[in-house]
């Protein structure tokens, strides 16, 4: 069975990371910002898996598990902030979060 070349896997991870970064910069809705962060984290995890597969080391898979647990924690905290923002201001606009300080 032929493996996917390292360049193809890293190119896909780079494209996914760039798409997540664009979504992070362009969108003002906090839900889309969280989704863009998830795409970026999954792109980094994909790069770890591809690199670990290339050199036959399980380190990439271990890093993937760590990134996956970090993404789960980030999603739960982000969704909790999203719920509080919506309950207080009835909007999901990320600029409304600056008004939460008072």
Swiss-Prot record:
Its EC number is 7.1.1.-. The chain crosses the membrane at residues 6-26, 30-50, 62-82. Its main location: membrane. Gene3D superfamilies: 1.10.287.3510. It is an enzyme of class 7 (translocase). GO terms for cellular component: NADH dehydrogenase complex; plasma membrane. The keyword Membrane applies. GO terms for molecular function: NADH:ubiquinone reductase (non-electrogenic) activity; quinone binding. It is found in: Cell inner membrane. It catalyses: a quinone + NADH + 5 H(+)(in) = a quinol + NAD(+) + 4 H(+)(out). GO terms for biological process: ATP synthesis coupled electron transport. It is a multi-pass membrane protein. Keywords: Cell inner membrane, Cell membrane, Membrane, NAD, Quinone, Translocase, Transmembrane, Transmembrane helix, Transport, Ubiquinone. Belongs to the complex I subunit 4L family. NDH-1 is composed of 13 different subunits. Subunits NuoA, H, J, K, L, M, N constitute the membrane sector of the complex. NDH-1 shuttles electrons from NADH, via FMN and iron-sulfur (Fe-S) centers, to quinones in the respiratory chain. The immediate electron acceptor for the enzyme in this species is believed to be ubiquinone. Couples the redox reaction to proton translocation (for every two electrons transferred, four hydrogen ions are translocated across the cytoplasmic membrane), and thus conserves the redox energy in a proton gradient. This is NADH-quinone oxidoreductase subunit K. It comes from Pseudomonas aeruginosa (strain ATCC 15692 / DSM 22644 / CIP 104116 / JCM 14847 / LMG 12228 / 1C / PRS 101 / PAO1).
